[in-house]
């Protein structure tokens, strides 16, 4: 099937590997403590704090614990390969197709990144998480204000646990950069900031441009569109 083929490289099927980034045990261990429960695991937080990587690290943890890679399916609406999943019906159809093609046995682990970009996503997530005839465990991420706790409790009928993901802490920053804990490294952390992708940039100008672009994205996608603000200059 062409849809399965198009998303294959983003999944662990057929011996594929995925980039898991820097280990963040503070979060992965928290998520892991709920493994085995059918409550929906929801990772929230602002854009680019590393939610996707924590999803992947959780999936790799499952594989290391003996779960078959065929029982794990990734869906990421930020990638064009998943453009065919526009609404809850598309999502439901894809999961059925995945089951027919991969034929997983036992519990199925579904990871959906940027779930808010799928219209009506909560209908499928609620249905699968409450289906006592099938064994699903669901993990989702969301970045914008549609994923605020107040709305989550309505969308998911209270059957979820939320993990709020933050940028790198000073301890994580020092560990990743292999820097000694102290005043000098702390000042560097304060200057650089904690966004994980900044680790790959050396130039201060590049870092500033990255943060400026991120700020504009948050304003446009999470504030202006959300609240239909007409006079953008007021921001």
Q: What does each model-found stretch correspond to?
A:
Residues 146-161, 177-178:
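Short regulatory helix/loop adjacent to the ATP-binding pocket of P-loop NTPases
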Residues 18-35:
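Pre-Walker A adenine-sensing motif
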């Amino acid at each position: 099937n062409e849809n399965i083929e198009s998303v294959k490289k983003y999944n662990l099927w057929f011996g594929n590997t995925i980039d898991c980034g820097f280990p963040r045990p503070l979060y992965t261990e928290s998520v892991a403590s709920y493994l085995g429960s059918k409550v929906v695991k929801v990772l929230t937080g602002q854009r680019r704090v590393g939610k996707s990587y924590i999803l992947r690290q959780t999936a790799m943890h499952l594989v290391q614990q003996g779960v078959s890679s065929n029982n794990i399916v990734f869906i990421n609406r930020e990638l064009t390969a998943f453009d065919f999943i526009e609404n809850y019906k598309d999502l439901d159809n894809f999961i059925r197709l995945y089951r027919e093609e991969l034929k997983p046995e036992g519990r199925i682990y579904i990871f959906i990144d940027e779930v808010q970009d799928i219209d009506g996503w909560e209908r499928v997530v609620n249905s699968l998480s409450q289906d006592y005839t099938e064994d699903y465990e669901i993990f989702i991420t969301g970045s914008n204000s549609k994923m605020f706790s107040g709305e989550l409790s309505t969308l998911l009928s209270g059957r979820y646990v939320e993990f709020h993901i933050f940028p790198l802490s000073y301890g994580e920053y020092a560990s990743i950069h292999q820097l000694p804990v102290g005043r000098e490294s702390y000042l560097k952390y304060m200057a650089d900031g904690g966004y994980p992708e900044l680790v790959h940039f050396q130039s201060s100008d590049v870092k500033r441009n990255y943060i400026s672009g991120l700020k504009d994205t948050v304003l446009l996608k999470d504030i202006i569109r959300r609240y239909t603000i007409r006079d953008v200059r007021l921001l």
